[in-house]
């Protein structure tokens, strides 16, 4: 009986851990924007203002669940765009905001699949380079 309860507790713990990847997007959604003049562009742009919960994740290893956004010629890459939502609902299709996507650099190439996957890596924040996404996951590995 004791082993049964230990197995249940371990199962619940594993389930909570595996769900934590989807909670990461909820934290990353806590972002605001400020209008700031950009010299290069010659007009005001929206610059992200990261909340304290997001700032606490910077440089930390996080787990995130999401979808690979396919690009032409994609088979297996070490650099790709990752989304909280499937392709038909993602930021690039007009269905979500820029806080729902991130750039990813993996240690090993990840083969494309339409189903959600889980990645683990180090989160980098970007509020300066308007040619890049706000979030970047580096040294990432596919864990599920």
Feature names for model-found ranges:
Residues 19-144:
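OB-fold and OB-like single-stranded nucleic-acid-recognition modules
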Residues 1-4, 18-20:
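Absolute protein N-terminus
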Residues 3-14:
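Sec-dependent N-terminal signal peptides
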């Amino acid at each position: 009986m004791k082993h049964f309860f230990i197995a249940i507790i371990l199962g619940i713990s594993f389930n909570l851990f595996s769900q934590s990847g989807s909670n990461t997007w909820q934290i990353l959604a806590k972002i605001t924007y400020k209008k700031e003049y950009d010299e290069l562009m010659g007009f005001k742009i929206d610059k992200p203002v990261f909340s304290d919960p997001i700032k606490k994740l910077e440089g930390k290893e996080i787990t995130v669940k999401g979808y690979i956004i396919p690009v032409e010629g994609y088979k297996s890459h070490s650099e790709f765009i990752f989304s909280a939502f499937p392709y038909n609902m993602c930021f690039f299709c007009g269905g979500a905001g820029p806080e729902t996507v991130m750039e990813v650099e993996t240690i090993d190439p990840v083969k494309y699949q339409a189903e959600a996957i889980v990645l683990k890596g180090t989160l980098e924040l970007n509020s300066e380079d308007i040619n890049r996404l706000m979030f970047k996951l580096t040294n990432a590995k596919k864990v599920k």
